[in-house]
Amino acid sequence: MNIYDVLIWMALGMIALLIQYGIWRYLKGKGKDPIPLQICGFLANFFFIFALAWGYSSFSEREYQAIGMGFIFFGGTALIPAIITYRLANHPAKKIRESSDSISA
C-alpha cells in the first residue's frame, strides 16, 4: 500500500463525512430530522461509500468484474434507503379538515 492508496481511503472518509453532514442539513432544513430518517440516510451514505470503496479496491487488484458487481449490489442497495429518506422527508403533512363557520342547508 503506497501513499496514494492511503490518500484515496482518507478522501473516501471525508466524502462520507460531508455527505452525512449534507443529509443532516437537508433534513434539518425540512424540519424533519427524527432518528429513523437519520439512520435511513446514514445507511444510504454507508452503502454508497462502500460501493465506491469496493470499486477502488477491486480496481487496484485488477478485478474488473468485481467493480461492476460491487456497484450493482452495493450501489443498488444504497438506492433503497436513499429513496425512502427522500420520500419521507418530502411527504406533506396531513391536512386537518377545518370546520365551516357557515351553516349549510
From Swiss-Prot:
What GO cellular component is one of the record's annotations?
plasma membrane
Q: Which keywords fit this entry according to its UniProt record?
A: Cell membrane, Membrane, Transmembrane, Transmembrane helix
The cysteines covalently paired via disulfide bonds are none
Q: How does it sit in the membrane?
A: Multi-pass membrane protein
Subcellular location field: Cell membrane
Q: Where are the transmembrane segments?
A: 3-23, 35-55, 66-86
What is the stated purpose of this protein? May act as a membrane anchor for the tetrachloroethene reductive dehalogenase PceA.
Recorded family membership = Belongs to the PceB family.
Q: What is the recorded name of this protein?
A: Probable tetrachloroethene reductive dehalogenase membrane anchor protein
Natural source organism: Desulfitobacterium hafniense (Desulfitobacterium frappieri)
Q: Which gene encodes it?
A: pceB
